[in-house]
Amino acid sequence: MEKWARIKYTPNLPLGENGERVTASQKHIELSCEAACEGMVLLKNDRNVLPIRKGTRVALFGKGVFDYVKGGGGSGDVTVPYIRNLYEGLSQYTSDISIYDKSVRFYQEYVADQYRLGIAPGMIKEPALPEDILADAAAYADTAIIAISRFSGEGWDRKVAGVDREIKCEAKDLVEQGNKIFDHGDFYLTNAEKKMVKMVKENFSSVIVVMNVGGVVDTTWFKKDDQISSVLMAWQGGIEGGLAAARILLGKVNPSGKLSDTFAARLEDYPSTEGFHEDDDYVDYTEDIYVGYRYFETIPGAKEKVNYPFGYGLSYTTFLLEDYKAEPFVASAADEVGKSDSDLADAIVASVTVTNIGKIPGKEVVQLYYSAPQGKLGKPAKVLGGYAKTRLLQPGESQRVTIALYMEDMASYDDLGKVKKAAWLLEKGEYHFFLGTSVRDTRLLDYTYELSKNIIVEQVSNKLVPTSLPKRMLADGTYEELPQTEPVDTYATIFPRPKNWKETIEHDVLKTPVVRPQDRFQLFLPPKEGDPKKFIEVAECKVTLEDFIAQLSNEQLASLLGGQPNVGMANTFGYGNLPEVGVPNAQTCDGPAGVRIAPEVGVVTTAFPCSTLLACTWNEDICYEVGVAGGEEAKECNFGAWLTPAVNIHRSPLCGRNFEYYSEDPFLAGKQAAAMVRGIQSNNIIATPKHFALNNKESNRKGSDSRASERAIREIYLKAFEIIVKEQSPGASCLQYNIVNGQRSSESHDLLTGILRDEWGFEGVVVSDWWGFGEHYKEVLAGNDIKMGCGYTEQLLEAIDKKALKRKDLEKRQSESSRCFSNSTKLKAA
């Protein structure tokens, strides 16, 4: 055993220097701003209008100037000491620019009035722009800045035009508000926004747009419009997002963000759009592995539908890439590293020299893509295989960038047996490699990796096989039919399913276990003969984990397999809570953008940028630093586990929680999130990647079936989780609510045991999402260790009586939880 995970209660003592708190400290807030600057993406900069020259007079337009959205709603929300909007950010630099005041006062008063009415940030209607203010502003300045903001959140998906039926969701008030505001869906500008933009364009020679959004939106309205000079994709930048945007607009920081998603010309251009709201009870992933750029770069006719490609982003300076090289690198003999074939080399190493040939210091992102032979399985035209961001290069400075790509990471999964059933394999043929600065801006390298025969990288077994998915897309844009089978309930149903889940869940919220207090001095008293074995003795190797668990009664074991009540600052419940044997009540906290504490507690924390922005940094170091800072805040506020990062795939722009997630690409999402996990766990705080898996829709999220092929599940939707598990050994994994191919994920032995534990070697604790619809005893059998926010002790005991469960099943689940708490999972430190 290396270290304890931080689960034992200690007072809320400051962890900073000189007795100061680190939570919401200036250091952490500055880090949040730095991260926001690093991930904002400059999409357009005609005539080099940006950065704004010193002495420029500017006029601000759009309710988004004050209606700033720091992040999305639900678990991703954070209670903060303040929020700095775009106007407040620009106001920090009044020595550099002059801001027209009448439009400022107009929008400030309007937004304040709307907030007083209880309308959420980002859900405010664009007001009509008074013509007298516009005329006066045009006389004052020739540069205009327009701010557009959007909001979405947990429990509901983004508005889309043309869907007239009522959609099952949990945030009907926000959906109704969206229906009032967004004429064409929130992907597009509203009529009021279009009118405001038109008025501004007609009166100013230089128009700059700042997009304060959490996900993909329409870009056609400005891409081909010569009257709009520059566009900054500012995303949702956390507590200091307005200041970060201001620093980029004024050239205090040179933008270096790159898109983590493809921006198509229309919402309808994404293959997922057509069926997203087709039915509340299921979603067919018929596009299969062709998600994001894999679709647009591969499928015939799709390339021209792209406005801004994956990996794209401008800078205020210019970089020259030269001296491209690629060569094989064999770290060890194939049999020594467990490869199945001696012909399989370890890696290709690609390198290029990046030189800043402009006049401004800046950073560039080098991206390595590969192209596998189509073979019998069919492949995307390009797949991201590696990336690296340069340091800040001064004008004239160069850096040699080297990226390694392991050959086994190019393997495809054969689910139907076209080559070898249920195998990860490399098909024979030529593998090509590309280096560049976006998926479109690449150079073909002069090294080709050629296989004369198919190579099996890993033989597994079929899991999560689809039962109702009728077809899937192929690389040529056609579809193949898939075999249909009946969903199988792995475990016998011994309890009737509730007819009204809503009432059941509401009852369970009130039924959470009571705190079982124990005199804290007893924790430090030496054990006496006859005393029960204590958990601390397991950590000290005085008692085996098996002996410790063996002494527990069935009732105690069953209790430990459910969530425990909130104490201290918590509002997402805890794990453990068996003080008579020294098992503490380890508290958890949300969420992906910072430690979330309920406003009524009175403790504020740092809101970091949304995960989409963090992905756009293409910088693992900044994600690690955010993880360290967030872990410190969790530690100082006495939490043992932080329910982050969220790494579901941006399958569709319509998903309401895309702001919590990183990218359309699983490799980028996995690497960025793995760095964050490493940072979190350097504090001995348990990181909890979620939502495992295929949580790509919020509407009817507890009843919707995600129907996907096994290949798509493994190559796209599980891959980010796999990277995190294998590289950083997270202490926990949080499941999702939805159904996957006819079976609830929390009841899926294939997912929780077959893939997560047996194939990937996961050793942490698996927890359900809070008050899901899975049956507790089935979850225990499948491999779910703790049912959150509370368990069903009586049901587990009855299941034992009815022979549906055995005591050893409870013991197995508790042994996994105990290993996590005592940190035998070896939480990795920096």
From Swiss-Prot:
Keyword Hydrolase: yes
Active site: D769
Function: B.fibrisolvens beta-glucosidase hydrolyzes cellobiose to a limited extent, cellotriose to cellobiose and glucose, and cellotetraose and cellopentaose to predominantly glucose.
EC number, as in UniProt: 3.2.1.21
Family assignment from sequence similarity: Belongs to the glycosyl hydrolase 3 family.
Record's protein name: Beta-glucosidase A
Gene3D superfamilies with a match to the protein in the record: Glycoside hydrolase family 3 C-terminal domain, Glycoside hydrolase, family 3, N-terminal domain, Immunoglobulins
A GO BP entry: cellulose catabolic process
GO molecular function terms listed in the Swiss-Prot or TrEMBL record: beta-glucosidase activity
Pfam families (UniProt xref): Fn3-like (PF14310), Glyco_hydro_3 (PF00933), Glyco_hydro_3_C (PF01915)
Catalysis performed (reactions): Hydrolysis of terminal, non-reducing beta-D-glucosyl residues with release of beta-D-glucose
Encoding gene (name): bglA
Keyword annotations from UniProtKB, A to Z: Carbohydrate metabolism, Cellulose degradation, Glycosidase, Hydrolase, Polysaccharide degradation
